[in-house]
Structures are given as C-alpha cells and as structure tokens.
Amino acid sequence: MYSLSISTSGKYISVAIHDDKLISTSSVLSENGTTNLLMKSIDEITKKSRIEKSDISVVYLDIGPGYYTSLRIGLAVEQGVCGSLGIPLVPVNGLDALAFAAHTGHRKICTIIDIKREEYAFCLYKPVPVSYTHLTLPTKRIV
C-alpha cells in the first residue's frame, strides 16, 4: 500500500506518493484555485505513478504553520478524500517535518517558515538518537 503526503501551507501545493521509498512528487505554484490545483495534482501524480487512489492507505497532511486559507482548503479537501477512501488522515507539523528532514544526529536545528505578511514561524530542536526534540515551542514573530 502507498502513502500520500500533501502540503498546502505555502505558495506551492506539494504532493508526494511513497511506500518504503519516494515514488513520485509534484509541486505547483498556487496563486488561486487551491482546491482545483490540489485535486488535479493528486490525479496527475497517481496517474504518473500508475497507482489507483484505492491503493493509498494513509494521507499525511502538513497542518502548518503556514498560509491560513490554504491550510484550511487542504484540510477540507483531504478530509473528503480520506472519508471517501476510508483511510486515516495524519496531521504533520510543518516545522517538525523540516527538522526531521534536516536531522543529522549531532547538530541543533532551527526551522523557519514564512507564514505571510512579514510573519515567520520558527522552532529550535536538539538532536537525540534517530530523531530530535524541541528546545523551544513553535513561535510566531512579526518582522
């Protein structure tokens, strides 16, 4: 079975299909029409990967921080997709996902996300075996 990972938290709609390894990704600039672009991106990536939507067993969704309206649209669309397929929707904190991707096992990590209008969210992490732990709680700052 396959997993679908989605982010609508920023300027781009990003979609990925993976199992034990990454199979396919797509990233599209979202100026307007996030709902249509998200559904189109999911359709295109499943076709490109030759995977039926019914073969997807879980959806991981970036729940922010990020662009408020885009996050709400992503959540609404994916609740519908997961409900129709009868599969779980797993929320993923965007700052934590960035820290996990950058994890080296020996360095502190600071993740920063632009959340619009000169506002940024950030969090500091310290390494622990195989993962990381928060040094600070996620924080929002206006520049």
Language-model segment annotations:
Residues 58-89:
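DPxDG-like acidic metal-binding loop motif
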Residues 111-132:
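Beta-strand/loop-alpha-helix module characteristic of Rossmann-like adenine-cofactor folds
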Residues 91-110:
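Conserved phosphate-binding catalytic cores of ATP/NTP-utilizing and phosphoryl-transfer enzymes
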Residues 45-49, 84, 102:
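Stable alpha-helical structural segments in soluble proteins, enriched in small hydrophobic residues
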Residues 16, 101-103, 121-124:
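Short, well-ordered secondary-structure micro-motifs
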Residues 3-5, 60-62, 70, 109-112:
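Short glycine-aspartate micro-motif
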